[in-house]
Amino acid sequence: MLDINQIKEIIPHRYPFLLVDRILSVEDGRKAVGLKNVSANEPYFQGHFPGYPVMPGVLIIEAMAQVGAVAVLRLPEFAGKMAFFAGIDRARFRRQVVPGDQLRIEVELQKLRGTVGKARGAAYVGQELAAEAELMFAVR
């Protein structure tokens, strides 16, 4: 398990764009499971949407990318580097994510060739699938 301070040693994101609070498990270069506690105090809820706060889908995808980046950047050859989005396929949003929800984010790397790779991510609230996507990334 990794706490927020350990996560910040691996990925460069910071408030308000650090979208993972804890890593529950990680297999370096293979997969990671993380948590995001969705608080009513998140800055994006001021405008998305007033009176009906919903976590933007793009931020759920970004949370997946950050969890996946932890797994990739723990590999010795990528220590101290950054992972960048290179593409996204088959993104689907199945359930709204609202204040008070806890997102469990599961990301599994499917392919890594040199510094470019592909991963599959899913985000759950409880046992309910909230979002899923295939993510492409490049490490620099």
Swiss-Prot record:
The keyword Cell membrane is assigned to this record: no
EC number: 4.2.1.59
Disulfide bonds: none
GO BP term, pick one: lipid A biosynthetic process
GO cellular component assignments: cytoplasm; membrane
Presence of the UniProt keyword Ion transport in the record: no
Active site: H48
Coiled-coil regions listed: none
Functional note: Involved in unsaturated fatty acids biosynthesis. Catalyzes the dehydration of short chain beta-hydroxyacyl-ACPs and long chain saturated and unsaturated beta-hydroxyacyl-ACPs.
Protein name: 3-hydroxyacyl-[acyl-carrier-protein] dehydratase FabZ
Source organism: Pelotomaculum thermopropionicum (strain DSM 13744 / JCM 10971 / SI)
